[in-house]
Regions:
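Glycine-biased, small-residue-rich flexible motifs in mid-sequence functional cores and linkers
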Residues: 1-5, 89-367
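Short, positively charged patches
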Residues: 1-139, 146
Length: 367
């Protein structure tokens, strides 16, 4: 990796090239052509054009980036000397959760890290929320971090004040593991490295950045960092959100991608957008992180349980098609849902006739 580091830095930060364009190229040379990134950069322009169908503008931008290789080689050496590591998207050390959630179009081509890289492979929980969070939101954050630690899950946060900082501090307090996702280049985080030196050395904190190592903090980098926090996590908990900002946009984007996101149910007197996010499809949870079912959902759950009992009782008396069952029990289920339920029951036998029929299995001595 050390020999290739300069090439990865060069490719990952070509001005104007987004993740989709970079990753598509990486797939083509590393998987389809089965060559290294160094071999790719050594190809003549004619081969770039022939093998990868690159436009003249792309080739011009690649050549401009290639001219910066000596500077990036020096930067790569400096990173190594200072204990930083690079994880390209092709590496088995790259977070599989991040890759699965962001895919080709949005996964960063290169991660800069410092700390225990194994943390990237563990089950993880992101706790997100407002910089100016209320006391109850911070208490919620503490509970979720404690629960995650107890379940041996890594806590992912973004190192902003408020919920982010509370999540990190709580994970440390409960002797858990954390990932800090930076809104800046990893070489500009010197104060943070001093603060969390012990936890980093002990293997409990991993620092991650996707930006150029020397990039200073910027508001736009903080916004670009937020999707990385969400994507590094298997579970997402929202302590508090307004109707604008990074937390709101991150949750909306996650819901659009069909991710299950847990949002703290606010008290009636609170002024935040948590209820709006729940209305949009997020799962309401209490201050301990337990799911809250509203009265209508509880009623449906009870009704379904009653139907299930009646189905099993009916099938003890003979063979029935799904239509027969629905009609006799006056159920509002679809046939496909009923079939799925019947297939999942060990005590139900399927009779292979047209149409299929179902009946209760005769018990044996060892049932």
């Amino acid at each position: 990796m050390n020999k290739e580091a300069a090439y990865w830095i060069t490719l990952a930060h070509i001005p104007g090239w987004g993740y989709a364009k970079i990753n598509t190229l990486i797939v083509r040379f590393s998987q389809e052509q089965n060559i290294s990134i160094g071999e790719f950069f050594d190809l003549p322009e004619t081969e770039w054009q022939r093998l990868y169908a690159l436009e003249p503008k792309d080739i011009e931008e690649l050549n401009a980036a290639k001219a910066d290789l000596p500077n990036n080689a020096f930067l790569a050496e400096q990173l190594e000397n200072e204990g930083y590591e690079l994880i390209p998207v092709t590496s088995p050390e790259y977070s599989q959760t991040l890759k699965a959630n962001l895919k080709t179009n949005h996964a960063p081509a290169l991660l800069y890290v410092k700390g225990n890289k194994q943390i990237l492979q563990e089950k993880s929980v992101a706790i997100v929320g407002s910089r100016n969070a209320s006391e109850v939101s911070l208490e919620f954050t503490d509970h979720i971090a404690q629960k995650a630690t107890k379940d041996f899950k890594v806590v992912v946060s973004g190192f902003a004040k408020g919920v982010d900082k509370q999540a990190l501090d709580a994970a440390i307090k409960y002797t858990g593991q954390s990932i800090i996702v930076l809104p800046q280049g990893i070489m500009t985080f010197s104060t943070g490295f001093k603060t969390y030196y012990k936890q980093i050395v002990d293997g409990d904190v991993l620092i991650v950045s996707v930006f150029h190592p020397r990039a200073p903090w910027k508001a736009e980098l903080a916004m670009a960092r937020n999707p990385i926090i969400y994507a590094l996590a298997d579970e997402i908990y929202v302590a508090e959100s307004s109707e604008t900002g990074g937390t709101w946009s991150g949750v909306i984007d996650g819901l659009r991608k069909k991710r299950k996101i847990y949002v703290r149910k606010p008290e009636p007197t609170e002024e935040n957008a948590n209820d709006l996010l729940i209305e949009k499809g997020a799962v309401a949870v209490d201050i301990q992180g337990n799911e809250i079912l509203d009265e209508s959902a509880l009623l449906v759950k009870e009704q379904d349980a009653e139907f299930e009992k009646k189905i099993l009782e009916l099938l003890k008396s003979g063979e029935y098609t799904t239509k027969d069952i629905l009609k006799r029990l006056d159920m509002n289920w679809s046939e496909s849902r009923l079939r799925d339920f019947l297939k999942a029951q060990k005590g139900i036998e399927t009779i292979i006739k047209k149409p299929l029929r179902y009946t209760g299995k005769q018990q044996t001595l060892f049932d």
